[in-house]
C-alpha cells in the first residue's frame, strides 16, 4: 500500500462525514435537545429524562457532535459552542433538506431504474419551507404586495403548508385576514383572522364560488412554490387553469418559483448554488415536482391571460443568486378567462 492511501481515504470520506453531520444536526433540532441547550448548559441525565430520551444513547450522540465542535462536554455537563449556537437560524434548511428529503435520497437508484417518483415527508417539507421563507420568500411576497394599488383585505394562500408563512403575512396588520389551503394545513387556526381548509389548490379553486361581480380587488391569492408541483402532478393545462381560476376570484395572484438553471456555470460556481440549489435541483428530478425557467413561467402566464405587474427576486443579502423569483399577476385586459 502506498503512503498516500490514508490521505486519499480521508478526502474520500468527507462526503460521508457531511452526510452523518447533516443527520446529526437535524436530530439535534428535532429531538428538542437544541432548545434546551439554547437556554444554557445542561446536565445530560436530567435533560435526557425530561425529554424522554435514553441517557446513555443521548450522551453518545452529544459526544459525536462535541467531536465536531458544535457542543462542549465536561463530565455530565453539555453546552452549545459558539459554532453550535450559530446554527439556530438555519434550522429550517435542515428540516427541509434532511427531515423532508432524507428518504428521497435513499431512493435514487430506484428512481433511476424507472420505479416511479421518490417519496418525501410532506409535513416536514412544509415546515422547513415555511421556516426558510421567513428569510426569503416572505419578504419577497411583502414586496410584491407593496406594488398593489391598495393593501389587500384578505390573502388566500393556495399552498400554505403549516400556516406559518400565511400567519407572517397577516401578523400585525389588524385589517388583513388569511385563508390557507393545503392538504397538510393545520386543523386549528393558530391566530385570529386565519382559517384553514385541508384541500389541494386546484380542487379548492374548482369548488370555490367565483364572485358574480368579477374578481375581488381587495383579495390576493398566493402560490409560493406551488406551481412546480401542479405542473408535474397535473400538467401544464392544470397550471394554466389554476392561474385563470385564481384571477377570476381575486384581483391579483402572487407567484414565487425557482428559476431552473442547473447547467448554468455562473449559478453552480456560486457558493449557495452548490450548497443549496444543486441538491435542490436534484430533489426535483427525483420527486413529483418540476422546476422551470423564468422564460417558461412568463410564457405560461401569457397563455393564462395574465399580465406580470412586477417581477422581483429574493433579498440578495440572503440569496444573491437571483434564482428565487416573485411575480405579481393580474388579468390581462381582453384576455379570455
Swiss-Prot record:
Pathway: Antibiotic biosynthesis. Keywords: Antibiotic biosynthesis, Methyltransferase, S-adenosyl-L-methionine, Transferase. It catalyses: 5-guanidino-2-oxopentanoate + S-adenosyl-L-methionine = (3R)-5-guanidino-3-methyl-2-oxopentanoate + S-adenosyl-L-homocysteine + H(+). One of its GO terms (molecular function) is methyltransferase activity. Its EC number is 2.1.1.243. InterPro entries: MrsA, SAM-dependent_MTases_sf, WH-like_DNA-bd_sf, WH_DNA-bd_sf. It comes from the Bacteria. One of its GO terms (biological process) is methylation. Belongs to the 2-ketoarginine methyltransferase family. NCBIfam families: ketoArg_3Met. S-adenosyl-L-methionine-dependent methyltransferase involved in the formation of the rare amino acid 3-methylarginine (MeArg), which is incorporated into the peptidyl nucleoside antibiotic arginomycin. Transfers the methyl group from S-adenosyl-L-methionine into 5-guanidino-2-oxopentanoate acid to yield 5-guanidino-3-methyl-2-oxopentanoate, a precursor of MeArg. This is 2-ketoarginine methyltransferase. It comes from Streptomyces arginensis.
